[in-house]
Amino acid sequence: MNDLQKYLSTAPVLLTLWMTFTAGFIIEINRFFPDMLGLYF
């Protein structure tokens, strides 16, 4: 169990989980509010 916890706390795993969450969040925001990203640039 300690090895699994150490593996899940490594940088590539955390980066993958964070990027997946961020991409999903942006996709959902664009689903409810389309073309909002174009207003900021």
Curated annotation (Swiss-Prot):
Subcellular compartments: Plastid, Chloroplast thylakoid membrane
Keyword Isomerase: no
GO biological process: photosynthesis
InterPro entries given in the database record: PSI_PsaJ (IPR002615), PSI_PsaJ_sf (IPR036062)
Keywords: Chloroplast, Membrane, Photosynthesis, Photosystem I, Plastid, Thylakoid, Transmembrane, Transmembrane helix
Pfam families: PSI_PsaJ
Annotated family: Belongs to the PsaJ family.
GO CC list: chloroplast thylakoid membrane; photosystem I
Protein name as it appears in the record: Photosystem I reaction center subunit IX
Higher taxonomy: Eukaryota, Sar, Stramenopiles, Ochrophyta, Bacillariophyta
Membrane topology: Single-pass membrane protein
Origin species: Trieres chinensis (Marine centric diatom)
Signal peptide (UniProt feature, chain positions): none
Function according to Swiss-Prot or TrEMBL: May help in the organization of the PsaE and PsaF subunits.
Membrane-crossing segments per the record: 7-27
